[in-house]
Amino acid sequence: MLGEDVNFQLEWVSIYTFQCRRMEKFRHNRVVFAGDSAHQVSPCGARGANSGLQDADNLVWKLKLVIDGKAPPALLDSYDSERVYGADENILNSSRSTDFITPKSQQSRIFRDAVLDLSEHFAFARPLVNSGRLSLPCTYDGSVLNSADALPQGPARTRPGAPCPDVALENGYLLPQLGNDFVLLCINTPAPEALQVNGIALRPLALSCDPETNTALAQRYLGDAPAAVYLLRPDQHVAARWPSYNETDICAALLRATAQG
């Protein structure tokens, strides 16, 4: 690092250690654990602080609905199941990064060294260099709050459970317009003026999309479908989606997304 001709003296040396672990459960009756109190990972990929924020995003809207009497306490159980799933994903990716950086076996070291040697000269090997893949929001596949995917032509990246990707629109960006409400995103299909289920308001947001002029919106939310309707949670994860507006299906999905269906 300093060069072979530079004289230096070590003043202090320490061994850096960390742990990748989590609690068995994040909810214990009226006590809820989040952030480092619930799970710990290595610093690779900035997964510690980011996962703590994701815990808060997941918990706060559920807690508010329960406190306001608009959802049963069982909704908080989904915080446990979803964020345990997210913690396991972070621990897996964090462990893979640290195992690449500090191999635990001779075979792993041979693989790591070969990847580093090849990546210097060949582009195909560079994605294999695992120096800490950056943290990404978790897709809650299999969540009890998800409804069955009714948009088979839609993109996989916005399936139920997935975080909403941002898109540039004529008047700004999509995510700031979603806010922290339940939102019914209607693309190339009529939207209702307003809808309320068991005291929970559902705010409609209608967008038109020409795939020729807004390819990002089309690729991320339409796929091969000409139109789409998305039910979006307050933490901006997809709860359900359909090819067109159907009030009965939407009300049922909203009840399911609040542990009432």
Residue locations for each model-derived region?
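Helical substrate-recognition/capping region of FAD-dependent monooxygenase/halogenase enzymes
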Residues: 67-261
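Secondary-structure transition/capping motifs at alpha-helix termini
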Residues: 1-6, 59, 65-73
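Functional cores that coordinate and move charged inorganic groups
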Residues: 38, 49-64
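Glycine-rich, phosphate-binding/catalytic loops in enzymes
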Residues: 27, 49-51, 248-249
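FAD/FMN-dependent oxidoreductases across multiple families
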Residues: 1-47, 93
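Catalytic cores of eukaryotic secretory-pathway lumenal/extracellular enzymes that build
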Residues: 44-50, 57, 76, 86-90
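Alpha-helix capping and helix-loop boundary segments enriched in small/acidic/polar residues
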Residues: 17, 21, 46-51, 70, ...
